[in-house]
């Protein structure tokens, strides 16, 4: 008699491949064979695919749909699943790095660090003066792989009105960062969702208005914008926070020169490369997507992935404004998320132009009418750093030990 535990490997792989990665923890506990297969087969394959996380009414949900069949006439059905978060906690904001999620919870007063695949969690209290506008980011020290959390808050005692704090998992403590060392000469309060953690560092996208409102100067700016691709308005750039040095790096050039009213969005491919979307209104109505060839805290280079002129496209919404997005490198297509006519939608574009629209449901049912924030996510075997007794330090580690006593274990909030 065939049972779940002795199914052929190809059948198991098919079942696991159709299971949301954030739900695999439950399936791993079914038997040792499923656990090993999910590690050796599913995690490496998931790293090559674009998956996503989003917040729906303060709940974390996984989002996936195949872009491989978009050239066919079949209706593309998105798969949205609520992730089983411990204790049914409500989440205000979500960030991630290295497969680990950083969740802002309880009216922004606490943080939950969580690996959904391993089912490991750790709770961290915010040091003081928690505010809904505080900015957070997660990364790690590349020298010893120890994770850290960056917090940027209002602090009017400092010259720029901002305070910078770092939480070091190795010491279980928050500490203030030196204002003069940290001051990056930019208005961090203009940053909302425009940050991505990559290779242990966090990259912030900064946009500002560097143009005069007078008509003659606008025309001069337009001419420069059209004719010189190398000119960079000073308030449009990337800035990297390096968790190893605990400092901001120099300004990194964008591959285009956006005006303040144009749309720029930031995403990533796995844990290796940044992806940037630019929706132009000035010189032409179109969308460009760029991918990094090289990226580190002090240097970046770009290649154009896709360019689509949306003016002549049949069916493309007139009032379309790009927000979050995801790309499929193999098929050379992108899904760009937007709210249109009270519905949350994913617009699929490619080299052939506008391909199709995927209906994600009424906006009131997904985020209370707010733009759908899609965050590219790759699961990992990186453990959540446990709270260490004084005198002990422990860095980031993979799940290399045996899974002894893990079968059927309950989730515990540590720390």
Swiss-Prot record:
Signal peptide bounds: none
Which residue windows does the record flag with biased composition (Basic residues)? 403-415
Per UniProt, the ranges with Acidic residues bias are: 210-229
Q: Looking at the record's lineage, which domain of life comes first?
A: Eukaryota
Q: Which Gene3D superfamilies match?
A: 1.20.1280.50
Residue span, F-box domain: 1-50
Query: Where is the segment annotated Disordered?
Result: 209-229, 387-415
Q: Which Pfam families match?
A: F-box, FBA_1
Concerning CDD domains, the annotation shows: F-box_AtFBW1-like
Please name the PANTHER family in this protein's record: BNACNNG10540D PROTEIN, F-BOX PROTEIN CPR30-LIKE
Q: What is this protein called?
A: F-box protein At3g13820
Q: Organism source for this protein?
A: Arabidopsis thaliana
């Amino acid at each position: 008699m065939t049972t779940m535990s002795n199914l052929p490997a190809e059948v198991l792989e098919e079942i696991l491949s159709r299971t949301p990665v954030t739900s695999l923890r439950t399936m791993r506990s079914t038997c040792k064979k499923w656990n090993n297969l999910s590690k050796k087969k599913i995690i490496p394959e998931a790293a090559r695919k674009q998956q996503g996380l989003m917040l729906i009414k303060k709940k974390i949900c996984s989002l996936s749909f195949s872009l491989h069949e978009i050239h066919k006439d079949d209706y593309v059905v998105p798969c949205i699943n609520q992730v089983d978060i411990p204790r049914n906690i409500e989440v205000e904001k979500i960030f991630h790095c290295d497969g680990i999620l950083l969740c802002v919870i309880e009216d922004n007063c606490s943080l939950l660090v969580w690996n959904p695949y391993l089912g490991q969690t750790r709770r961290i209290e915010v040091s003081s003066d928690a505010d809904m506008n505080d900015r957070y980011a997660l990364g790690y020290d590349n020298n010893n792989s120890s994770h850290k959390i960056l917090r940027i808050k209002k602090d009017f005692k400092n010259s720029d009105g901002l305070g910078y704090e770092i939480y070091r998992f190795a010491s279980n403590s928050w500490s203030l960062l030196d204002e003069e060392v940290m001051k990056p000469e930019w208005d961090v309060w203009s940053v909302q969702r425009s940050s991505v953690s990559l290779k242990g560092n966090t990259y912030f996208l900064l946009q500002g208005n560097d143009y005069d409102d007078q008509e003659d100067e606008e025309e001069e700016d337009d001419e420069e914008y059209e004719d010189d691709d190398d000119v960079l308005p000073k308030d449009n750039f990337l800035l990297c926070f390096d968790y190893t040095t605990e400092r901001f790096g120099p300004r990194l050039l964008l591959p285009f020169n956006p005006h303040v009213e144009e749309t720029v969005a930031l995403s990533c491919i796995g844990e290796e490369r940044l992806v940037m979307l630019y929706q132009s209104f000035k010189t032409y109505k179109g969308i460009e997507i760029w991918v990094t060839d090289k990226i580190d805290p002090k240097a970046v280079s770009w290649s154009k992935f896709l360019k689509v002129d949306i003016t002549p496209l049949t069916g493309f919404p007139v009032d379309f404004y790009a927000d979050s997005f995801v790309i499929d490198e193999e098929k050379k297509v992108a899904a760009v998320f937007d709210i249109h006519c009270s519905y949350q939608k994913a617009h699929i574009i490619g080299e052939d132009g506008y391909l199709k629209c995927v209906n994600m449901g009424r906006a009131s049912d997904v985020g209370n009418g707010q733009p759908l924030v899609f965050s590219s996510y790759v699961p990992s075997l990186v453990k959540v750093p446990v709270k260490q007794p004084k005198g002990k330090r422990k860095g980031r580690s993979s799940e290399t030990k045996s899974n002894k006593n893990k079968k059927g274990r309950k989730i515990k909030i540590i720390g």
